[in-house]
From Swiss-Prot:
GO terms for molecular function: nucleic acid binding. Pfam families: UPF0102 (PF02021). Belongs to the UPF0102 family. This is UPF0102 protein PSPTO_4420. Gene3D superfamilies: 3.40.1350.10. It comes from Pseudomonas syringae pv. tomato (strain ATCC BAA-871 / DC3000). SUPFAM superfamilies: Restriction endonuclease-like (SSF52980).
Length: 128
């Protein structure tokens, strides 16, 4: 088993890699690791006039299912609830259109450069 601190570090690196990728695609960061009593929003971005709630999922290997499959119905519900709370608390974004994206990253950590670790950006991965 991989120690928790190593897993957390790999997760932070994957999030930083995803953020850099999205910014290169023209999205702007609103919030990162926004916490509430119902969960966490990894990245809240702005794509044009759309608020994008991005769930970043990293899996070293897909022995128990891949990164995309880990965003199941239960996780989607938690993300929707957290997004609703975000829009209530940060009300300046409440009237903007919203969507939920998933960034799925699989492979060995430490080489998040896009050539050896594939990144899969799923726009509008699910509906609220």
């Amino acid at each position: 088993m991989i120690p928790r601190s190593t897993r957390q570090q790999a997760g932070r690196e994957a999030e930083a890699f995803a953020l850099q990728f999205l910014q290169q695609q023209g999205l702007r960061l609103i919030e990162q690791n926004w916490l509430c009593k119902r969960g966490e929003l990894d990245l809240v971005m702005l794509d044009g006039d759309t608020v994008v709630f991005v769930e970043v999922r990293y899996r070293r290997h897909c022995g128990w299912g891949g990164a995309v499959e880990s965003v199941d119905f239960r996780k989607q519900g938690k993300l929707v609830t957290a997004a609703q709370l975000f829009l209530q608390q940060v009300s300046c974004w409440a009237d903007y259109p919203c969507r939920f994206d998933v960034i799925a990253i699989e492979g060995s950590p430490g080489s998040f450069d896009g050539s050896t670790v594939p990144l899969n950006w799923i726009k509008s991965a699910f509906d609220s």
